[in-house]
Every structure is written in C-alpha cells, then in structure tokens.
Amino acid sequence: MTLDEIKRSIKSGEIKSDTVVIEKGSLTPTSGGLIPYTVFHGWNIASSYECDESWGRSNLELFEYIEKQNFDDKQLEETLASIQTEDHHWNWFKKSVGTTGEDYKWFYLYAEGKPQAACLIYHPKDSALENSNIFYVEFLAVAPWNRSCLVRERKYLGVGSVLLKTALSFSVNNLGLSPGFSLHSLPQASNYYLKLKMVNVENRNKDALLYFELSQLEAKKLLGAT
C-alpha cells in the first residue's frame, strides 16, 4: 500500500487506531476558564495525519495574516523571529509509518476535538546521569496555536508539559523505566527544557542540537513525588 493509498484509507475511515485513553484533565486557556483534555496512547496514523493537516493549515493562515499586515522590515523581522517554526517540516504521518515497533510509544493530547500536542518516545535509553534506563523523546510538538508569537495569542498554556508528564508517568508505571527522560533539543526549545531543570550533557550534543536529560530527582518532582 502506498502512502497516498494509506491517506485515502484514513479519510474513508478504513484504518482503525489502537489508541487507548490514559489520562483526562483540564487545560487553562489564555482567555480564562478550563477546557477538558484527553491523552491517548498508542499508534494512530490517522491522528498523526490530522496533526499534519490541522497544524499545517494553522501555520499557513498565520503567514497569510502576516503578509496582509504591511509590516515594515523591522516589524516583519521581529514578528517572524517570535514564531517557533523549527519543526514545521516534521511529517507526523511519515513518522507513524516508520515507527510501529514496541520500542516506540505514541501519545496524543486532544481538546475540543483537535490534536493539541503529540509526542513520540523511544525506550529503553541509557541515562547519562544515573545507572538506569529511561526513555528518549524522539519528537514532541504542540499545535501552532499553542505557541507564543507577537501576532497571535496562545490558546492553551502548558500543553507540552502536560503531555511530557503523562509520558513520564506511563514510562514508570507501564514500562518499568526509571523516572527521567532525555532528548535532543531544537535551538528555539532549549530555554523551555532549561526551565524544566533538565541538564545539558555536552558529550551527547549533536551539532546545534543540545542533549538534555531530566534527572531522577527532578522527574520525581515533576510527577508530584518528593
């Protein structure tokens, strides 16, 4: 079956997912109040395709809006610099096709019927900080409308952190891994991981991608333990 045939099967509803609900809670919109969310675990190529479609459309709408504003060079430069687009080329559909093994785990966070964030992890991964096995975040992204920029208010706060915490809890309780995780960070995301108190392990950096790991102590704090 070709990729185009798979996409047609997704649209027709022929392809079924094997996801299960592993968490429910509430997100905080920037406009106030609370909105319920659901985190699904499991391989779901339809959800990955939905991420590509809805997130790509959102980015296109944002850039079309910017184009109509007639910004001067300085305003345009500042506006574009405020937009996190380093992962815009990620193709979640193709990532799903290539990651069907048991050593990969998928997580999707939905609210109001839309994918708000997605995460793919690999396990086990040796810890660089402790003598233990943790997981490695292959890819983590939130929807474009959940990112700060100068011309669009972020819709929901803390979506990425919610999904990371859910994946961490799942890895400890269901995969038998030690608390903690690691990843290679895109440059624009490094400050976020530093705020999580992740440690940069320099000998595992890859060119411009810094290697971060969350220690067991900080992971337990993230999970609500002491």
What do the PLM-derived regions correspond to, one by one?
Residues 157:
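Mg2+/Mn2+-dependent nuclease catalytic core
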